[in-house]
């Protein structure tokens, strides 16, 4: 009976030691994964800053801004005239806005 109890005790201790070693190994892997992630993010940020310093990104942004402005200017002009016509219909109800 004592031999059985000693065997169970020994197996329990070995199992706990194994679980502790696995847990420590998992924490180590998790820490290395997190540090690797932050290193990747930092490297990406450095690359992005280097690209932003270059004229290529600035040229692309300027071209995009100009294209957007060209496309939206007529839309906002029409919206402005429509808004003025709408508001003028409240101010002077006798005058009707020109219909198209």
Curated annotation (Swiss-Prot):
<dbReference type="GO" id="GO:0030301">
    <property type="term" value="P:cholesterol transport"/>
</dbReference>
<dbReference type="GO" id="GO:0031210">
    <property type="term" value="F:phosphatidylcholine binding"/>
</dbReference>
<dbReference type="GO" id="GO:0034374">
    <property type="term" value="P:low-density lipoprotein particle remodeling"/>
</dbReference>
<dbReference type="GO" id="GO:0071402">
    <property type="term" value="P:cellular response to lipoprotein particle stimulus"/>
</dbReference>
<dbReference type="GO" id="GO:0008203">
    <property type="term" value="P:cholesterol metabolic process"/>
</dbReference>
<dbReference type="GO" id="GO:0009749">
    <property type="term" value="P:response to glucose"/>
</dbReference>
<comment type="subunit">
    <text>Monomer. Interacts with NAXE and NDRG1.</text>
</comment>
<dbReference type="GO" id="GO:0034375">
    <property type="term" value="P:high-density lipoprotein particle remodeling"/>
</dbReference>
<protein>
    <recommendedName>
        <fullName>Apolipoprotein A-II</fullName>
    </recommendedName>
</protein>
<keyword id="KW-0873">Pyrrolidone carboxylic acid</keyword>
<dbReference type="InterPro" id="IPR006801">
    <property type="entry name" value="ApoA-II"/>
</dbReference>
<dbReference type="GO" id="GO:0043691">
    <property type="term" value="P:reverse cholesterol transport"/>
</dbReference>
<dbReference type="GO" id="GO:0042627">
    <property type="term" value="C:chylomicron"/>
</dbReference>
<dbReference type="GO" id="GO:0042632">
    <property type="term" value="P:cholesterol homeostasis"/>
</dbReference>
<dbReference type="GO" id="GO:0031072">
    <property type="term" value="F:heat shock protein binding"/>
</dbReference>
<dbReference type="GO" id="GO:0060228">
    <property type="term" value="F:phosphatidylcholine-sterol O-acyltransferase activator activity"/>
</dbReference>
<dbReference type="GO" id="GO:0042803">
    <property type="term" value="F:protein homodimerization activity"/>
</dbReference>
<dbReference type="GO" id="GO:0050821">
    <property type="term" value="P:protein stabilization"/>
</dbReference>
<dbReference type="GO" id="GO:0046340">
    <property type="term" value="P:diacylglycerol catabolic process"/>
</dbReference>
<dbReference type="GO" id="GO:0048018">
    <property type="term" value="F:receptor ligand activity"/>
</dbReference>
<comment type="similarity">
    <text>Belongs to the apolipoprotein A2 family.</text>
</comment>
<dbReference type="GO" id="GO:0010903">
    <property type="term" value="P:negative regulation of very-low-density lipoprotein particle remodeling"/>
</dbReference>
<keyword id="KW-0165">Cleavage on pair of basic residues</keyword>
<dbReference type="GO" id="GO:0034384">
    <property type="term" value="P:high-density lipoprotein particle clearance"/>
</dbReference>
<dbReference type="GO" id="GO:0008035">
    <property type="term" value="F:high-density lipoprotein particle binding"/>
</dbReference>
<dbReference type="GO" id="GO:0032757">
    <property type="term" value="P:positive regulation of interleukin-8 production"/>
</dbReference>
<keyword id="KW-0445">Lipid transport</keyword>
<dbReference type="InterPro" id="IPR036172">
    <property type="entry name" value="ApoA-II_sf"/>
</dbReference>
<dbReference type="GO" id="GO:0046982">
    <property type="term" value="F:protein heterodimerization activity"/>
</dbReference>
<feature type="modified residue" description="Pyrrolidone carboxylic acid">
    <location>
        <position position="24"/>
    </location>
</feature>
<dbReference type="GO" id="GO:0033344">
    <property type="term" value="P:cholesterol efflux"/>
</dbReference>
<dbReference type="GO" id="GO:0070653">
    <property type="term" value="F:high-density lipoprotein particle receptor binding"/>
</dbReference>
<keyword id="KW-0964">Secreted</keyword>
<dbReference type="GO" id="GO:0033700">
    <property type="term" value="P:phospholipid efflux"/>
</dbReference>
<dbReference type="GO" id="GO:0042742">
    <property type="term" value="P:defense response to bacterium"/>
</dbReference>
<keyword id="KW-0044">Antibiotic</keyword>
<dbReference type="GO" id="GO:0060621">
    <property type="term" value="P:negative regulation of cholesterol import"/>
</dbReference>
<feature type="signal peptide">
    <location>
        <begin position="1"/>
        <end position="18"/>
    </location>
</feature>
<dbReference type="GO" id="GO:0034380">
    <property type="term" value="P:high-density lipoprotein particle assembly"/>
</dbReference>
<dbReference type="GO" id="GO:0034190">
    <property type="term" value="F:apolipoprotein receptor binding"/>
</dbReference>
<keyword id="KW-0813">Transport</keyword>
<dbReference type="GO" id="GO:0050766">
    <property type="term" value="P:positive regulation of phagocytosis"/>
</dbReference>
């Amino acid at each position: 009976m004592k031999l059985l109890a000693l065997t169970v005790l020994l197996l329990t201790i070995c199992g706990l030691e194994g679980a502790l070693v696995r847990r420590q190994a998992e924490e180590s892997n998790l820490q290395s994964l997190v540090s690797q992630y932050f290193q990747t993010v930092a490297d990406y940020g450095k690359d992005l800053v280097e690209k932003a310093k270059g004229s290529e990104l600035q040229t692309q942004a300027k071209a995009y801004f100009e294209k957007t402005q060209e496309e939206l200017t007529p839309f906002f002009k029409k919206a402005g005239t429509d808004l003025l016509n709408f508001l003028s219909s409240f101010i002077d109800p006798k005058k009707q806005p020109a219909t198209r």
